[in-house]
Amino acid sequence: MGKIIGIDLGTTNSCLAIMDGKTAKVIENAEGHRTTPSVVAYTDSGEILVGQAAKRQAVTNPDNTFFAIKRLIGRKYDDKAVQEDIKKKVPYAVIKADNGDAWVATKEGKKMAPPQVSAEVLRKMKKTAEDYLGEPVTEAVITVPAYFNDSQRQATKDAGKIAGLEVKRIINEPTAAALAYGVDSKKGEQTVAVYDLGGGTFDISIIEIADVDGDNQIEVLSTNGDTFLGGEDFDLALMNYLIDEFKKEQGIDLHNDKLALQRVREAAEKAKVELSSAQQTDVNLPYITADATGPKHLNIKVTRAKFESLVSDLVMRSLEPCKKALEDAGLSKSDITEVLLVGGQTRMPLVQEKVKEFFGKEPRKDVNPDEAVAVGAAIQGGVLAGDVKDVLLLDVTPLSLGIETMGGVMTKLIERNTTIPTKKSQVFSTAEDNQPAVTIHVLQGEREMASANKSLGRFDLADIPPAPRGMPQIEVTFDIDANGILNVSAKDKATGKEQNIVIKSSSGLSEEDIEKMVQDAEANAEADKKFHDLVTARNTADNLIHSSRKAIQELGDKVTAAEKEKIEEACKELEAATKGDDKQAIEAKTKALEEAFAPIAQKAYAEQAQAAGAQGGAKAEEPKKEEDVVDADFEDVEDDKK
C-alpha cells in the first residue's frame, strides 16, 4: 500500500506533507519552496502553469490566471458572497453554469468548474510527492475550512478525483493544526483554541487534547467561522486604498485597467507582508498607466498604523465567531489553556494583539502557520494507513442539518458541533389526507426559516397508502460519515418502502462530469508532456547552433570555407525547424548538424592534443617546489549560511 499524503489546499497557498517514519515532513516543490501558490494559468500556447510560474505571469495574463478559486468551490453563482467577490476582486470571468454553480471561463470561452481548476494544484502536489517518494501516489487526506458546508466538501473531493487522487478523508483545517500540535505536545490534558485566518477563509475551533489510555485523543468541542474572510480581503482593502490615493493625485481610476489592477494587487500583498515587520513601506509602481500628458507612476508611502486602520474591521469580524465557538463549547475564555495561530494572515501584529486581548493569553509562536495544517493532514493519513497508532481524532459537523417541514420551517435532526460520524432518525408524517408522496427537502444551516438555509438536495418517497393526515409514519434518517458528508434516507414504516439520497452531487458535478474532467486532465497531462518535450528539443537545438557557430569562429583558418558553409547551412535548417512544432523534424535537423560538425570537432581536438603534447615535452623540467602551498581548514557551509 502506497503512502497517504496530506494536502492543505489553501486559498492563497497550498502545502504538502507525508509521514516519514513516525514524523510528518513537509515536502518542497520542484522550485524548492515549502508552499505552492494556489494559482493556475492557461497560456496562449495552450500550456497550463501552476504555482509560482502561474503567479509570475499574472500581470500580463490577468484574464486567464485563476487565483482564490477556493472561494468559489461548491458555491452557487447567485450567492451574495460570490457576487461581492465578482464585483470587488477577480480580473477573470466568473459565470453561471447550467446547474446554477459559480464556474470560471478563460478569455477564449473555455468554461471550467472550480474543482477542475483546483485539481491542477492537487496534481502538482501529487507529482511533488511522487518525485520525492519515487513511487505512484493515489491516496490523500485533504483539508477544508471547518465552516465549509456539504457542497464545498464534496466539491473538494471531486477536485481530488479529477487530479487522480482517492480522497481517503476530508479533515477540518483547525483540527489538522491541533493534530499537528497535539501529537508533538506532551502536556497532558489541554483545551486549545485554534484561530485559523488563511488567505480566503476564517475558522475558530475549540479542541480538547487528552491522554486516554495512552492514546492522544483530540476532540473538537465546537467550531465556527466565516468562509469569506481572509488575507485576500486584507489585500483588497490596501489595494483599494492605493487606487483611491492614486486617483486623488492623478485623476485616473485604475479599477477598469486589468493589467494595472493586477500590478497593484501584487504590490498590496507584498506591502502587507512587509508591514508585519516594518513600521512603513513604499509602494512604487513606475509606468502604472498613461494619459495624454504621458506615463504615470504610482508612489505611495504606507505606514503600519494606516494599514491597521484599513483592516481593523476585518480583524474585529473574526472575534464574533470566537465568542460563538466558546458559547457552543460551554466554556469561558479562562478555560482555554493554549491559543494556536494558523494561516499566513496571523503573522500580522494587529491580529496577534487582538487575539491576545480576546483570550487573555499570549498565542503560541512555535507552530508554523503555513505548514501545521498539511502536517496534521499527513498525520491523519498515517492514522488511516495504520502507521500512526496512538491518535484518536473526534471531529464535528460545523452546521446543523435537517429537513423542511410544514409551514416552511427547518426541523433539525443533527445539531451543529455534533461529533462525527453520527446517525440520527426522526419520525414525520403527512400534512394532508390520503397524501400519496412526501418530498424530503434536505437543508444545512442555523435559520428557522427553511428558505434561509442552504439546500443540499431533495427526493420523493412515493406510493404511501391512503390514510388520514398524521397517520403514516415516515422515518427520516441522517447519516454523516467521517468526512462530514451526508446520506439521507426516508422509510414508510407501514410498507417498509425506502428511498435515500447521498448528498454527493451537491457540488453540481455528476459522476459523468467528473469522469469527463478526469479524462480531460489526463489528456492535458499528455499534451503538457508533448509541449515539454518540444521545448526541450528546441533548447537542445538552440544550444547546439550557438556552440557550433562559436566553435567555427574560434577555429578560424583551421576550418575550410566548404566546411564553414556546410555547418552554416545545417544551422539555418535547424533554426527553421525550431520555429515549427514538429519535434521529430527538430531532432532530425539537430542530428544532421551534430554529424556535420563531428569531423571538424575531431580534427580540432586531434590538433589540440598534438600541440599540448609538444608543449608538455618542451617543458618536462624539474617540478616546482611546493613552498607557496598554504594549509587551510575547510568548513562545509549549509544552505542557510550561504
Curated annotation (Swiss-Prot):
Residues 609-642 are annotated as: Disordered. The keyword ATP-binding applies. One of its GO terms (molecular function) is unfolded protein binding. InterPro entries: ATPase_NBD (IPR043129), Chaperone_DnaK (IPR012725), Heat_shock_70_CS (IPR018181), HSP70_C_sf (IPR029048), HSP70_peptide-bd_sf (IPR029047), Hsp_70_fam (IPR013126). Induction: By stress conditions e.g. heat shock. Residues 628-642 have a biased composition (Acidic residues). PROSITE patterns: HSP70_1, HSP70_2, HSP70_3. Keywords: ATP-binding, Chaperone, Nucleotide-binding, Phosphoprotein, Stress response. It comes from the Bacteria. Pfam families: HSP70 (PF00012). The modification Phosphothreonine is found at T201. Acts as a chaperone. HAMAP family: DnaK. Belongs to the heat shock protein 70 family. This is Chaperone protein DnaK.
